[in-house]
Amino acid sequence: MTEAGPAGTDTDGPVSAGPVSTGSAVATAGALWAVGGVVALLVWAVYRLARISIAAFDQPFAWYHWAALLAIIPFMAWSEGLRGFQLRFSPRVAERAMTIRSQPTLLRVVLAPLYAAGYFEGTRRERLGVYFGTHGILVLIVLVHRLDQPWRGILDAGVVVGLSWGTIATLALSVRAWRS
């Protein structure tokens, strides 16, 4: 077996995480995998949470349930949808997908959704934000899971709105980045 040439180009050598041809189908597939993987995760979460949210309406709602629902939906649209996704997360996903397209490496292409989300090759601050954000979300999932209906469904309705906004923002910003 021979050693890999520059940037892992020798096909008889070991696989490397080096650069992949920029204009290649692999680079394009990697960028699509980045956005598609992130969007698939968001859509899956919306689907699961929407079912729980809809089930809340099987319970009788008092005025305070309606008040909570009417407060949580615009709050989550603003905080999660606009501030969290449209202004922070979605632009990063679009930008990093285009980085995969223009500067692909084997690692970036294979782990494209994780790269696009910022789990590696970002600044220390970005990575810490992603890891702490992920852990915070996991803690919230555990806590909300313990709530009884209709409260769980009310909170999940807000999350569904935020995640739906995030899905649309991620797709729209990615299409815009792809065209530029």
For each predicted feature, which ranges?
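Cytosolic-side membrane-entry/anchor segment at the start of a transmembrane helix
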Residues: T2-I52, L163-S180
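Membrane-interface segments at the starts/ends of alpha-helical transmembrane spans
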Residues: S21-V26, I54-H65, W151-V160
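Hydrophobic alpha-helical transmembrane segments of polytopic
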Residues: W33-A40, H65-F75, V130-G133
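Juxtamembrane "helix-exit" motif on the non-cytosolic side of transmembrane helices
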Residues: V46-A56, G81-Q86, V142-R152
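Hydrophobic alpha-helical membrane-embedded segments
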Residues: F57-A94, I168-L171
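Membrane-proximal soluble regions of multi-pass membrane proteins
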Residues: G81-T123
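Alpha-helical transmembrane segments and their membrane-interface junctions
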Residues: G118-D148
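Alpha-helical transmembrane segments and their immediate juxtamembrane interface regions
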Residues: L140-S180
